[in-house]
């Protein structure tokens, strides 16, 4: 008779508390090791981020600042050279060439992978069309003003646009104008009066020219004067108002479209081309005689090259501006922009023989001080606004 089945007893040692603790210790050490590695990675990422966000040294800031200043001077000088021809009247054609070159340049740079912006979209174009039209008016009136005014006077009067923009922001965006800002505005107006004083007094003190036969006053004057005053001041006033409208309405439209800097530049130039071409064909004289006067054979190649170069320079200005803001910060950039008006104004004296008299020099100096005071005022205002927002959010200023 067979024996009943009896399971073989387990003669192995049961798990001891020490072996269980060993497994727990191994899991804990793995967890701690993972946490340590993750902490090391986070610390390295934080160090790299802090390194990127740290303000570059003064030596690192020199190149972007010089690039921004050089781009501003170069653009002003080239435009002044192009429009200063004795018989140049085809401003719309000039602007069309500049815009075409600019679009070609940014498209090429985009394909090379250096920048990125939106592809063309009909809805975006429809929304941005009024802004491009305003830009055409800004550039055209600015070119006409630069045609009749010296670079120092043009640069100084351009400051008046800041006043119009500031008060436009008060009405459209609930902005505010501080006392220091008002001081800068007073200096801007004063510098403009100093710059234009010689022309103003010449109009007041000018004796009427009489016809030797009839003895009557001769009222026919050169095309460059309106009411005896340099026509450039009329164009400059129009430019200031249109420039302020362009900046204010573009700010509102950017909120709708969500455009970035390169998007704005691309659409501005692309949409302005058909407007400029139509105005050039309708208004400007395309006859052979007019073309010969506007583009004389003696410097035709140089003139056309300067037009194309100025279009490409617009891309350089946009890049150098973004580079300067990124490296130096908005405060330093605003100060550089204020002080940069001095070499831009001085370029007219150096390259175009504008008189270096007491009126011009003092106007440039007062305008430079006005720009610095305005930059300081805007910086202080930004700090106050940031502190106010921090208090509203419940944080510490």
Curated annotation (Swiss-Prot):
Q: Which gene encodes it?
A: GMT1
Query: Which stretches are Lumenal in the membrane topology?
Result: 83-87, 143-145, 198-228, 294-300, 354-355
- Do you know which InterPro entries this protein is assigned to? TPT_transporter (IPR050186)
How is the protein disposed in the membrane?
A: Multi-pass membrane protein
Q: Which GO terms describe its cellular component?
A: cytoplasmic vesicle membrane; endoplasmic reticulum membrane; Golgi apparatus; Golgi membrane
| Origin species | Cryptococcus neoformans var. neoformans serotype D (strain JEC21 / ATCC MYA-565) (Filobasidiella neoformans)
Region (Disordered) residue ranges read 1-57
Q: Which domain of life is it from?
A: Eukaryota
Q: Where are the transmembrane segments?
A: 62-82, 88-108, 125-142, 146-168, 175-197, 229-249, 273-293, 301-321, 333-353, 356-376
Q: Which residues are glycosylated?
A: 87
Return the protein name.
Answer: GDP-mannose transporter 1
Question: Which lineage is the organism of this entry classified under, starting from the top rank?
Answer: Eukaryota, Fungi, Dikarya, Basidiomycota, Agaricomycotina
Task: Explain the purpose of this protein.
Answer: Involved in the import of GDP-mannose from the cytoplasm into the Golgi lumen. Involved in capsule synthesis.
């Amino acid at each position: 008779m067979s024996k009943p089945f009896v399971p073989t007893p387990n003669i192995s040692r049961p798990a001891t508390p020490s072996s269980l603790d060993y497994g727990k210790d191994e899991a804990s050490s793995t967890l701690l090791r993972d946490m340590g590695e993750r902490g090391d990675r986070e610390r390295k990422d934080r160090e790299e981020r802090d390194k990127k966000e740290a303000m570059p040294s003064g030596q690192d800031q020199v190149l972007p600042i010089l690039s921004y200043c050089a781009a501003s001077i170069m653009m002003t000088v080239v435009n002044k050279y192009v429009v200063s021809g004795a018989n140049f009247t085809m401003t719309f054609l000039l602007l069309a060439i500049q815009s075409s070159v600019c679009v070609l340049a940014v498209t090429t740079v985009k394909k090379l992978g250096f920048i990125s912006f939106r592809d063309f979209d009909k809805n975006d174009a429809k929304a941005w069309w009024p802004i491009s039209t305003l830009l055409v008016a800004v550039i055209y009136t600015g070119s006409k003003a630069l045609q009749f005014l010296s670079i120092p006077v043009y640069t100084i009067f351009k400051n008046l646009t800041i006043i119009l923009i500031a008060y436009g922001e008060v009405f459209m965006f609930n902005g505010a104008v501080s006392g220091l800002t008002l001081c800068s505005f007073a200096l801007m107006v004063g510098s403009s009066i100093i710059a234009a004083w010689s022309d103003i007094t010449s109009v007041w003190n000018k004796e009427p020219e009489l016809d030797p036969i009839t003895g009557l006053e001769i009222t026919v004057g050169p095309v460059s004067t309106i009411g005896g005053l340099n026509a450039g001041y009329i164009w400059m006033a129009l430019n200031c108002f249109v420039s302020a409208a362009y900046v204010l309405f573009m700010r509102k439209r950017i909120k709708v479209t969500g455009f970035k800097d390169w998007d704005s530049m691309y659409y501005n130039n692309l949409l302005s081309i058909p407007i400029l071409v139509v105005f050039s064909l309708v208004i400007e004289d395309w006859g052979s005689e007019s073309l010969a006067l506007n583009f004389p054979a003696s410097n035709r190649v140089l003139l056309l090259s300067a037009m194309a170069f100025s279009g490409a320079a617009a891309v350089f200005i946009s890049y150098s501006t973004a580079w300067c803001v990124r490296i130096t910060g908005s405060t330093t950039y605003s100060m550089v922009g204020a002080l940069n008006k001095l070499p831009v104004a001085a370029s007219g004296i150096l390259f175009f023989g504008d008189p270096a008299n007491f009126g011009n020099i003092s106007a440039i100096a007062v305008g430079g001080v006005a720009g610095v005071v305005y930059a300081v005022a805007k910086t202080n205002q930004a700090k106050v606004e940031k502190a106010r927002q921090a208090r509203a959010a419940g944080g510490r200023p």
